[in-house]
Structures are given as C-alpha cells and as structure tokens.
Amino acid sequence: MPIQDFIAKIAKGPKASKDLTWDESKQVMKLLIEGQATQAQIGAFLMAMRFKMESVSELAAFTAAARAYVAPLSIPKELAVVDVPCYAGKSETFHSVIAGAIVAV
C-alpha cells in the first residue's frame, strides 16, 4: 500500500481519523526507513500522526519494525543507562519516569 493511503486513513480530522493496524504501522515504518516516501509525504504523515495522537499499538509496531533495521546496543552491565521517553507536551500528565529513574540510580 502506498504511503498516501496511510496518510488518508489518519488525516481525516479528529472524529473520522482511524488508528493504523499493527501490520499497517509496520508497513509505514518500512516505507519511511527504506526511503520510499518523499519529504513532503513524511512530513504529512508525521503531522497527521501528531494531530491524531499515536496509539500504543501503533508505537509498538513502529518500534518492532524499526528494530529490524538497527543493530542492538552493547552496553556494559555496570553502566547505569536510563532511557527517557520524549514528551510532546500534549498530555497534561505528571512525568514520573525521570524522577523514578533518578531514585532508582
């Protein structure tokens, strides 16, 4: 499926936009990583996802698809690493991850 079809599905406005399925999300990520979309299409897709708000399933599928293209990091066990998520600022929630990570380390 071309990226235009995915953009059309998620860019229909706040009430008509639909979440992508697991397979659709993986297909989109593959298109993006393999350079099969123009810069304008990538921008349109990312803006539509931002307005629609990504679902947990979509994010998990994007991550699963991207992992097929990236070698895992080799980090020594004695090194304390904290993976801090990015917050887009759209949600009005308390971000306890950073505070919890500081306490844990």
Model-assigned labels for residue ranges:
Residues 1-96, 104:
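Acidic, glycine/proline-rich low-complexity segments that act as flexible tails and inter-domain linkers
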